[in-house]
């Protein structure tokens, strides 16, 4: 069991994360290795070394991004299973054991995901992740059957190490390197297991919530990411006939919707002048024109205006 923990800035929440790891049921600590990539002033790494023998620290002040930290740590990963978490993230005490049971039972499953909540004090109570799956008829999710059940968040998702290490995060993507990494794995492995009985609590808001974008005063996120991230993802996802998987189409709409969601916050309004806004609107129109199916997203569901042709299902 291998955990990657990037430290890009000093954070006093590290001990919370390490405590939740040490409290896992029926998992011996000698079977867990936590690799911390510390790009800070070494304070956080010292906290880890002083508290738990399962922690190893790489001091890498040259690391500037989440993608760089993950790539560095992944190159040194050992063990059968791997996940990533940030300072302040915690796991329910049955998380590791439940994931391992799935991997042992279903040998072809590439990764396991669970229920997610944001526990940042900016919210009055734990806030449920919008893309939580809830109670499903089957814990095995096939994205060709259920394209709205994409798994976007890299943190808290347990992968088979050999699969995780066969991909590399794109450190040229300033904002969506984790989404790109997760989706490219799902293009090759469209089935995974979702467990509603395990819980991952993350400290920092993520892309389903407008708080993630406060303050998102970076114009390149509105424009450059469409060209540098979404368009290459779309082109790489096409099959021989030029068809785009429906779950990638779902993500396209989700991604563009979040940009409008972010702009609902007063800090982001008037971030672009009229000419810049016109460029963004034209770019998102060009991206959406690549869609083969019209998707309408609501807070709780997805509606399709047409049924896309499904490729053969690969059963596990």
Segments and roles (model prediction):
Residues 163, 167, 173-198, 204:
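A short, conserved alpha-helix in the catalytic core of glycosyltransferases
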Residues 90, 94-129:
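Conserved donor NDP-sugar-binding/catalytic core segment of glycosyltransferases
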């Amino acid at each position: 069991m291998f955990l990657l923990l990037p430290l890009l800035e000093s954070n006093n929440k590290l001990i919370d994360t390490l405590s939740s790891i040490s409290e896992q049921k029926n998992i011996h600590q000698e079977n867990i290795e936590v690799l911390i990539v510390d790009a800070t002033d070494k304070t956080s790494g010292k906290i880890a070394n002083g508290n738990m023998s399962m922690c190893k620290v790489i001091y890498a002040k040259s690391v500037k991004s989440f993608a760089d930290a993950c790539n560095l740590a992944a190159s040194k990963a050992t063990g059968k299973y791997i996940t990533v978490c940030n300072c302040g993230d915690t796991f329910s005490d049955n998380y590791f054991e439940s994931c391992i049971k799935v991997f042992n039972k279903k040998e072809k499953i590439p990764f396991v995901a669970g229920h997610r909540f944001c526990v940042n004090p900016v919210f009055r109570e734990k806030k449920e992740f919008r893309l939580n799956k809830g109670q499903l008829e089957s814990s095995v999710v096939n994205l060709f059957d259920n394209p709205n059940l994409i798994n976007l968040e890299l943190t808290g998702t347990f992968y088979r190490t050999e699969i995780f290490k066969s991909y590399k995060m794109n450190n040229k993507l300033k904002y969506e390197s984790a989404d790109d990494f997760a989706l490219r794995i799902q293009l090759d492995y469209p089935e995974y297991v979702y467990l509603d009985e395990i819980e991952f609590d993350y400290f920092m808001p993520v892309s389903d919530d407008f708080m993630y974008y406060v303050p998102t005063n970076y114009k390149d996120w509105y424009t450059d990411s469409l060209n540098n991230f979404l368009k290459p993802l779309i082109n790489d996802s096409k099959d021989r006939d030029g068809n785009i998987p429906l779950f990638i189409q779902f993500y396209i709409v989700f991604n563009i919707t979040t940009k409008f969601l972010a702009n609902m916050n007063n800090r982001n309004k008037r971030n672009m002048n009229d000419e810049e806004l016109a460029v963004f609107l034209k770019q998102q129109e060009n991206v959406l024109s690549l869609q083969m199916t019209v998707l309408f997203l609501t807070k709780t569901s997805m509606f399709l205006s047409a049924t896309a042709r499904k490729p053969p299902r690969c059963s596990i």
